[in-house]
Amino acid sequence: GIYESVIWKNNHALGANGFDINYLNPIIFFRPVEYSINSPDNMLIGLNLKYKVNARSFLFSQLVLDEFTLNELKANNGYWANKYGYQIGYKCFDLLSIPNLTIHLEQNYTRPFTYSHWNSANYGHYNEELAHPLGANFIENILILSYRKKRVTTNLKYIQASYGADYVGDTVSYGSNIYNDYNDRSASYGIDMFNGNKTDLKFTQFNLGYILNPTTNLKLEFSLVNRILKSETNESKTLFYSFSIRSDLFNHYYDF
């Protein structure tokens, strides 16, 4: 599938467009329209692909282009406005022909300053990122293993991420925080991945549960979490465990 989106700001300066009727055009690739009307809005285009390997497994991927200059990309000079990202992954059910054993592998990558803008028309909402909790300027690897035997459930999740954060007290934007103005960047060239305060995150979670009521998914569960965060300026380690009784809707997003 191919998709395109636009985020606009209603309170532009006098003479700016705000919402334009052209944005209702259902035809993909209307980016030239944006240029023709001198739009200050934030647009991107993307592609998603899914390939079914067999009845029990599939590959999936996404590509997003925020801004893109082919000549600058070929020059390989770290041009700041080559803003893009990708996701690639694999999921398999009944792994190794073992019933109810599932594996999920995934990698996410986003260049610095992707999803950001020179004004508040970024890809965020209520001070949260719409695309990924790490914002931009990161690479993330995910492994999830889950298994169920009758009423016993287990789940192991491991996440490793590296990203370039901003320095505390520094007004320069290094491309991770999408709420920062990209005009406040440190340079226009030589912007490499993990630009800024390089930070490494390791997150491990193990869950063991017993389903009391399959209809409502009411279960007893034990959870153990280990989180290690290391940067150029800070290091923190967190280990905690919990016991719970709950009937839940699954939340798979703990990678922040």
Question: What does each of the following model-derived ranges do?
Answer:
Residues 1-256:
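Exposed, low-structure sequence patches enriched in small/polar residues
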